[in-house]
Amino acid sequence: MRILFVTWAWPSHLYAMVPVAWACRAAGHDVLVASQPELTGTILGTGLPAAPVGGDVDAAAVFREIALPPPATERRPAPGGPRVLGLLTTLAEAMTDDLVELGRNWRADLIVFEPTAFAGPLAAAALGVPAVRHLYGTDLLSAAGRFLPDALGPLCEKLGIAAVDPFGAATLDPCPPGLQVPVGSRRLPVRYVPYNGPGLLPAPPPATPPGRPLVCVTWGTTLSRLDPGLFLAGQAARAIGGLDVDVLLAVTPAQRGLLGPLPAGTRVAESAPLHLLAPGCDLVVAHGGAGTLLTALAHGLPQVLVPRLPDHVRHSARLGEAGAGVVLPAEEAAPEAIRDAVAGVLASPGHRDAAERLRREMHGQPAPAGVVPELELIAAGGTPS
């Protein structure tokens, strides 16, 4: 079987699909990952073969407009949701023609796409092959389903297809049920296996007094890419430096210079995937990105989240509703608020209990290898169980 995985050029959306892609490869199937040229090097870094399609689009510019308040002299732009949907249709338009040609020439049997890569189901419909959606977090687009036919209508017309199901024949869902919202198509649960990119195992930490909590602070990669002022990892570390905790900062080399002065004893881990750092931690302070959130939950860690982008806000809200942490709106995340939230979560066993409950749910879902037979069934024209 030939399985074509599709994402637009955003690394975290790719990373969510890597474990299932490798499970398919290990089962003997041919796997290819298609995305815009900008992501080619990142795909190759996963060990999977890449196929560039379409042209690059400056998605960061749209997210930057959403995340940063407009100058007082400018009119406030449209809400973030419509602008994001407009961006996603632009990305689909940039990729779809090349993706259809690639799928035809490569003779794809199945397309697996991340939920915001509409080029995936569009190409599948044009090629007459099934498509399966692969979530990277909570199902953010299920609530937007009624808007998608109109948004994708012009692309369907261009491809000569009557309509497209943007949710696919089924949805691979790595979220534990206690975190997820209702899914827009048949749900195929799959265990979340953290893949946070390649990296080095950090040196063992120095010995600390028994019972002293270790707090990991990370701000992902998106916000520093949009604007250095949105990267709050250094501020968060300084905010909690006065507590009786050890602080571990997880950053990229490019982010190291954005941290500023740090409290004495703060450890900084560069280029270390979060899943290698999480096992020794007691709490994660972060920005609310899905990859960070799910990786922390995979280790049963409660979280303090300061989300800013719309998807981060919605992922974080679900974590807060599940009781596995505290969410601080970005505009209210003063240093003392972060410090108090961290102290409160560490002192409350209820947050850790909720995180542990979600961890058990997550580990109770089938491993990536366990969903490969379902994908084989869908590719053969069957209905998943």
Where are these regions (language model features)?
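Nucleotide-activated sugar donor-binding and catalytic core shared by glycosyltransferases
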Residues: 1-8, 17-32, 141-142, 264-385
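Conserved nucleotide-sugar phosphate-binding/catalytic loop shared by glycosyltransferases and other
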Residues: 32-80
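Short, polar loop motifs at secondary-structure junctions
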Residues: 35-40, 115-118, 174-179, 251-257
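Conserved nucleotide-sugar donor-interacting segment of glycosyltransferase catalytic cores
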Residues: 39, 84-163
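Short glycine/proline- and acidic residue-enriched helix-loop micro-motifs
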Residues: 74-87, 219
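Alpha-helix C-terminal capping/helix-to-coil transition sites in glycosyltransferase folds
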Residues: 105-107, 167, 279-280
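A short, active-site helix/loop in glycosyltransferases that binds the activated sugar's phosphate group
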Residues: 157-189
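Donor-nucleotide binding loops and adjacent catalytic segments primarily
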Residues: 191-283, 313
